[in-house]
Amino acid sequence: MLYVICGIVLFLILLFIIIFLHFKKKYDFYFLKVSEANNNIEIIIEKKIEILLKIAQIIDKDKIKELEEFKGKELTSHQCYIELNSIGNKLLKEADDEEYESNKKLNNLIDRFDDNECDLKGVLKYYNDNAVEINNYKHKFPSNIVGFFLHYKELDIYKIEK
């Protein structure tokens, strides 16, 4: 009888370990995807700053100082994304003026900016999809136990502008 009880306890412990490792691998998989997306977001944001600097050289020299100060700030990618959108929208509104319509260099930069925005939105969607999966695992049984023991936090979601 003692052997049966020990066998059942050992089986339950082994089952718990297998379940724990299974969900840990799922978490690790999604965290790997999120970190890859974060790296891509940072690269694309750097390219966006470079393009905005070139546009600012043509349109508004005062914005160059603002962008240089922005470049020196220590911001999270979420804050960076929000502030760059507002700066980019201001510059693009100024670029829509009639005096700049015939400027081919500016038009090429705006096209590059639009391509960069499409890439950024795609990477942000990829990040959001994987962050939502991690956040869902954080609230479901038994993966919430794994998340609790490994101290996983919920991830922030980007608000993507249309």
Task: Give the location of each predicted region.
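A helix-centric hydrophobic-segment signal that preferentially recognizes long
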Residues: 2-162
